[in-house]
């Protein structure tokens, strides 16, 4: 489980399949779109078979109602957008009960769900995605059913404490004295694949152990394995993983223009270094994907005395210029801040309501 109204964006061929209507894409073209910027697919052979045999498969991503969503969530919104463009029915699970299992206080649970319910669709609006095939599902709407509860008990007879703890180790905050709820978490996430009728579950690579847990144990309780698709985790602004619990590492969806500019200005961005560079990573996984799908170039503005403006058609061009030190960190940061502020416009347009919901959910 990862810790509306958008408009269709036509691509001018920088990713060659984006300009096609969904119905005109071949299975091979859909595969390449789904694979874009992924780290691992388990298994690609199963995905190829699915694309050839099922007209409209279903993919789901779950996000637990815990910390306040940040711009790193745009990475998975873009990947879900790729699935939409490939003709999938896409489900986003707003996992309120998972939030409680991972430390959200029960009195705040519904308030955090309401906050997520408001901001998650705006992620798709920010990247210009047509979401008519997107379905947002509240976890407790189906996870409280008698059949789900029976399956959860049945599942618990097939797994050990160590199985559950190992599966959830990178996702759940266990601490020195782990609570039982953290061991229930991976069982529910596995069953969600079944109850959401998903062919694929998508998540960050930090979900890998839970996804493999699902593949191993679902057949033991009578359900088929699903395909698992993972994308990398992008570094935060201070070089570590971008985290909702560390305000210095991330840009909040509700940050104003000054907040964004200040955070990017102070971000780790050592000249010529790609590793742990959150600014470059956001360029790769968000900004340049959106630019390319729109058929746009990235223009980095510079005074003539410093060589004038730079134009880039791809992330690879940016990285080459950066590692060869033809692109200065300050110029990269200025461009990133400008593009991030554009992406955050849908959130700022609804600032009053978002702030109200945020204050209630995160007092």
Where are these regions (language model features)?
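Divalent metal-coordination and catalytic microenvironments
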Residues: 70, 120, 239
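Short functional linear segments
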Residues: 23-43
């Amino acid at each position: 489980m990862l810790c509306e109204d958008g408009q269709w964006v036509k691509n001018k061929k920088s990713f060659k399949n984006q300009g096609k209507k969904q119905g005109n894409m071949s299975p091979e073209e859909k595969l390449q779109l789904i694979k874009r910027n992924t780290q691992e697919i388990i298994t690609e052979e199963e995905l190829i078979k699915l694309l050839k045999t099922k007209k409209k498969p279903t993919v789901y991503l779950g996000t637990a109602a815990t910390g306040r969503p940040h711009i790193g969530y745009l990475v998975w919104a873009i990947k879900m957008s790729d699935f939409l463009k490939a003709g999938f029915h896409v489900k986003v699970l707003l996992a309120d009960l998972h939030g409680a299992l991972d430390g959200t206080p029960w009195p705040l649970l519904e308030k955090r769900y309401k906050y997520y319910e408001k901001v998650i669709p705006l992620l798709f609006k920010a990247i210009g995605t047509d979401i008519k095939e997107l379905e947002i599902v509240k976890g407790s709407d189906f996870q409280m059913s008698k059949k789900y509860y029976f399956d959860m008990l049945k599942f618990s007879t097939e797994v050990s404490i160590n199985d559950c703890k190992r599966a959830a180790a990178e996702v759940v905050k266990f601490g020195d004295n782990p609570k039982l709820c953290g061991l229930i978490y991976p069982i529910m996430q596995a069953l969600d694949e079944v109850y959401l009728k998903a062919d694929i579950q998508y998540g960050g690579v930090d979900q890998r152990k839970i996804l493999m847990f699902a593949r191993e144990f679902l057949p033991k309780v009578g359900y088929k394995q699903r395909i698992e698709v993972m994308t990398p985790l992008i570094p935060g602004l201070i070089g570590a993983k971008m985290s909702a619990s560390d305000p210095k590492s991330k840009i909040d969806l509700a940050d104003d223009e000054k907040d964004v500019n200040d955070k990017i200005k102070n971000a780790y961005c050592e000249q010529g270094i790609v590793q742990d560079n959150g600014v470059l990573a956001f360029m790769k996984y968000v900004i340049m994907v959106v630019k390319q799908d729109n058929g746009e170039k990235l223009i980095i503005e510079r005074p003539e005395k410093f060589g004038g403006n730079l134009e880039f058609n791809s992330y690879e061009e940016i990285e080459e210029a950066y590692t060869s030190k033809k692109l200065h960190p300050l110029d990269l940061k200025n461009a990133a801040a400008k593009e991030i502020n554009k992406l955050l416009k849908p959130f700022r347009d609804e600032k009053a309501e978002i702030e109200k919901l945020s204050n209630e959910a995160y007092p």
